[in-house]
Amino acid sequence: MGKTQPLPILITGGGRRIGLALAWHFINQKQPVIVSYRTHYPAIDGLIKAGAQCIQADFSTNDGVMAFADEVLKSTHGLRAILHNASAWMAEKPGAPLTDVLACMMQIHVNTPYLLNHALERLLRGHGHAASDIIHFTDYVVERGSDKHIAYAASKAALDNMTRSFARKLAPEVKVNSIAPSLILFNEHDDAEYRQQALNKSLMKTAPGEKEVIDLVDYLLTSCFVTGRSLPLDGGRHLR
C-alpha cells in the first residue's frame, strides 16, 4: 500500500511575511498547504509553483469568508490544521469613522476565524485524539491594551477568548491555542530610530524573525496535550 498523503494545513494571509514563511516551512517538509491571500503578491506564484493551493479571498465581508470556506470544502476531505494568520492594523485617527475602524478590526480578527472554525470543523474532526489543530495569532496588546489601537486590541482580545471557547468545543480531537507575539520582524521602510525604540521595549532587545514563530507553531502541532492556551512571544516585554 502507498503512503497516505498528509492532510493539508490551511494558512490564512499566507502571501507575505510570517504567513509566507510558515507556508514555505511546511512545503519544505512535504506538507500540503492551502493558503488564502487577498492581494496577489509575486510570492503567491512561487507558492503555486511549489505545489501549494492558493485561494484568493476577501475576508472584509461574511459572504467573502463563507465563499472561501466553500472553496476549501470543495478542495479537501480533511485538514491537519488551521492557522489564523490573516490580520489588519488600523488606528483610531482623525478622519477615520470610529464605527468603520471597529467593524474592520472585528471582521478580520473575530468574524473570520469564528465563521471559518465553524464552517470547516468537520474537516478537522475524525482523525484521532489531538490529531488536528487550530492556532489563532493574537497580539501582545491583548495583555496590555493600546491607547492608539483600541479597536485592534479589543478584536485580538476577543480572538484570544475564542481560543478557550473553541478548545472546549472541539476537544479532544482538536487542540486550539493562540500565539501572542509582539515585535517579530521589521518592515523594510522602518528607519533606524524606530527600530531602536521598538527593540528597547523588550528585555531581549531583538527582532527574532519568522523562525521563532515557526518553532512555536511546530511545538503546538506536535503536542498531544496543550490546548486552550495563549503562548506569549514577546521577548519579556511584559517585564519592561
From Swiss-Prot:
Q: Which reaction does it catalyse?
A: (6S)-5,6,7,8-tetrahydrofolate + NADP(+) = 7,8-dihydrofolate + NADPH + H(+); 7,8-dihydromonapterin + NADPH + H(+) = 5,6,7,8-tetrahydromonapterin + NADP(+)
GO molecular function terms attached to this record: dihydrofolate reductase activity
> Per its record, how is this protein called by name?
Dihydromonapterin reductase
SUPFAM superfamilies, sorted: NAD(P)-binding Rossmann-fold domains
One GO BP annotation is:
one-carbon metabolic process
InterPro entries cross-referenced by the UniProt entry: NAD(P)-bd_dom_sf (IPR036291), Sc_DH/Rdtase_CS (IPR020904), SDR_fam (IPR002347)
Role noted for this protein: Catalyzes the reduction of dihydromonapterin to tetrahydromonapterin. Also has lower activity with dihydrofolate.
Active site per UniProt: 152
Disulfide-bonded cysteines:
none
Q: Which family does it belong to?
A: Belongs to the short-chain dehydrogenases/reductases (SDR) family. FolM subfamily.
Specify the species. Escherichia coli O6:K15:H31 (strain 536 / UPEC)
